[in-house]
A protein has these predicted regions:
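Non-heme Fe(II)/2-oxoglutarate
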Residues: 1-80, 88
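Intrinsic-disorder/low-complexity, polar/charged segments enriched in Ser/Thr/Lys/Arg/Asp/Glu/Gln
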Residues: 4-8, 104-106, 163, 193
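Extended hydrophobic/Leu-rich segments
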Residues: 5, 18-21, 58, 62, ...
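Short beta-strand-to-loop capping motifs
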Residues: 10-13, 111, 196-200
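Secondary-structure boundary elements
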Residues: 67-71, 112-116, 201
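A structural signal for short, well-ordered beta-strand segments and their strand-loop junctions
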Residues: 73-78, 106-110, 118-121, 175-177, ...
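Catalytic core of non-heme Fe(II) oxygenases with the double-stranded beta-helix
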Residues: 80-169
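Catalytic core of Fe(II)/2-oxoglutarate
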Residues: 142-218
């Protein structure tokens, strides 16, 4: 756990409900999770920017999460899955440049398997915006070093190790801040987790204030 960045939530979770929703959608078309080897079942197709039609299936959870905050990012909200511990989500940020307010926080609910989220010191001069989404907006940062050294190389892993500031084990629901570079490491597969990315949150709403709201409502 990293205070103010990635913390456990004291909330009740109906795992059977999440499994039921996952089994409903995994029979249908999946979505690539950006450039990563993860497979996702989210509210928006990452490649086209069009709705996937899963909102009805996900409504039991979305309806509760909208009580916390009415805005969520369609592209990132849904299930993220990996069938191997060799697959991870590379170090990145998640940002929203197309909303009125800048803040965004993710709830991550483990459903199957296990994973760890590593966090890294984030220096402006070491990151860049590599691409735009289907709507024409930059949506994440990447390390220059990843492009220069290559993802997964010993040199880049050493770079990450030198900048690691902490981690959190995703074995129960967590709330995370995503403007700091972080990556997801699968430690037990198959891995499936639910993510709701609440966005368009006013900048004066702190991590702790939002966490308290999540725990009060959920």
């Amino acid at each position: 756990m990293i205070k103010g960045i990635a913390e456990y939530l004291d909330i009740n979770i109906n795992t059977d409900l999440y499994l039921t929703m996952y089994n409903m959608v995994k029979k249908h078309d999946n979505n690539t999770f950006g450039k990563t080897p993860f497979v996702s079942y989210s509210l928006e197709d990452n490649r086209t920017g069009k709705p996937t039609g899963y909102e009805k299936a996900f409504w039991p959870v979305l309806n509760e999460h909208k009580r916390v905050h009415p805005h969520y990012q369609f592209r990132s909200t849904g299930f993220n899955t990996a069938n191997s511990t060799e697959k991870d989500v590379f170090a990145h940020t998640d940002i929203d440049l197309d909303t009125e307010h800048p803040n965004g926080y993710n709830i991550v609910v483990p459903v199957l398997g296990n994973s760890r989220i590593d966090y890294f010191e984030t220096r402006d001069e070491e990151v860049y915006l590599p691409e735009k989404n289907a709507h024409g907006h930059a949506y994440y940062h990447e390390f220059y070093a990843q492009k220069e050294m290559g993802q997964g190389t010993p040199e880049f892993e050493k770079f990450l190790s030198d900048r690691k500031i902490g981690h959190i084990i995703v074995d129960k629901p967590i709330l995370i801040q995503t403007t700091i570079m972080h990556r997801v490491v699968v430690t037990e597969a198959p891995r499936c987790a639910w993510v709701t990315r609440w966005n368009n949150i006013p900048k004066d709403v702190s991590f702790q204030e939002f966490k308290q709201k999540v725990e009060n409502i959920l």
